[in-house]
């Protein structure tokens, strides 16, 4: 296993192609309410050199040259709080131990950049959501917001 920061748009698209195939069934069963994740929308929106180097920070867990996990964090100035934030955008992995290596890598990166605040989330429909919430709390995260969705 190796963790690699993804800064190249072609490599970013390859990671998403590999993960979409790898997690297709899981995404259908445990994904977000109403809305499946759109691989192409993510690639089109974030797969640009300037964004991957400055705003959307992406790390992939590579095994035998193929992506088996990815974590993405958005770095931005939160205008409500007047603070730079590091917000989890997407996180998926086939191995919880390797998955947390991705998270630790991202958090270390944010700390080195001097970012003071990090937000993380979890999908309610996922079987391990309650366990993940407890892990977040053990890591020092505090519950701040709940999000609700309704189809109109």
Task: Spell out what each predicted region is.
Residues 119-132, 152:
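Conserved beta-strand-loop-alpha-helix junction that forms the acyl-donor binding cleft
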Residues 77-88, 144:
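A conserved beta-turn-beta hairpin within the catalytic core of GNAT-like acetyltransferases
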Residues 87-98:
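A short, internal acetyl-CoA/4′-phosphopantetheine-binding micro-motif in the GNAT/acyltransferase core
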Residues 24-46:
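Conserved GNAT-fold acetyl-CoA-binding loop/helix
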């Amino acid at each position: 296993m190796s963790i690699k920061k993804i800064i190249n748009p072609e490599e970013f698209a390859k990671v998403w192609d590999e993960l979409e195939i790898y997690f297709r069934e899981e995404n259908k069963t445990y994904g977000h309410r109403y809305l499946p994740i759109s691989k192409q929308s993510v690639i089109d929106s974030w797969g640009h050199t300037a964004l991957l180097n400055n705003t959307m920070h992406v790390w992939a867990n590579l095994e035998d040259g193929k992506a088996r996990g990815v974590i993405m964090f958005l770095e931005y100035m939160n205008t409500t709080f007047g603070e730079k934030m590091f917000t989890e955008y997407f996180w998926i992995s086939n191995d919880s131990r390797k998955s947390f290596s991705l998270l630790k890598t991202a958090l270390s990166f944010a700390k080195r950049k001097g970012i003071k605040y990090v937000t993380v989330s979890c999908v309610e429909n996922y079987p391990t959501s309650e366990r993940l919430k407890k892990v977040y709390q053990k890591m020092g995260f505090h519950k701040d917001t709940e999000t609700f969705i309704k189809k109109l």
